[in-house]
């Protein structure tokens, strides 16, 4: 299972008023995703990036039956939950905690926050959706209380069907998230400057 391997950057946790949890994609690294921070309006944030064992949060597509991705998926969700609980113990309120993920990390980000919906600082998902062979509404509880959420994706995308992105946005909106969802025609499986600009405007603008 996943070891607790956390890389930090940005402001010291002891001094920061906000913290951003960053989740890398399949085959990526914590250092990798931390490099994205230089393009975001997060200069006064502490940055926390867990490293997935073997660089992968779960083995199969996020659209596979959930049991196929176990026990890795539960372990990955547990890693994120441990990070959040550690931050709360250090004095951060949940509305001071932000999340960002790309691809597999975006799926994990969305899955974690929607299973534990509350007022967070904000959420950014670059190409991702809720996990499972279908949406399981019974897995999700809580209320986002207008937490700003940005979801950007390509149509088509080789890993993430746009229909799942729409379904994910609807679940988040039902839980009172303030969702900005943008679908880019033929963008490819990547992060673009426009997505970064939109994420900065919608989520990292306080």
Where are these regions (language model features)?
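Gly/Ala-rich beta-loop-alpha elbow adjacent to hydrolase catalytic centers
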Residues: 100-105, 109
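Short beta-strand immediately N-terminal to the catalytic nucleophile in serine-hydrolase-like folds
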Residues: 99-101, 126, 152
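Serine-hydrolase catalytic machinery in alpha/beta-hydrolase-like enzymes
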Residues: 2-94
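Short alpha-helix in the alpha/beta-hydrolase fold that links the catalytic acid
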Residues: 33-36, 137, 161-171
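A conserved short beta-strand
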Residues: 118-131
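C-terminal catalytic histidine-bearing segment of alpha/beta-hydrolase fold enzymes
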Residues: 26, 166-169, 173, 177-206
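Active-site signature of alpha/beta-hydrolase-fold catalytic machinery across serine-
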Residues: 35, 111-115
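Short beta-strand/loop motif that positions the catalytic acidic residue
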Residues: 149-153, 157
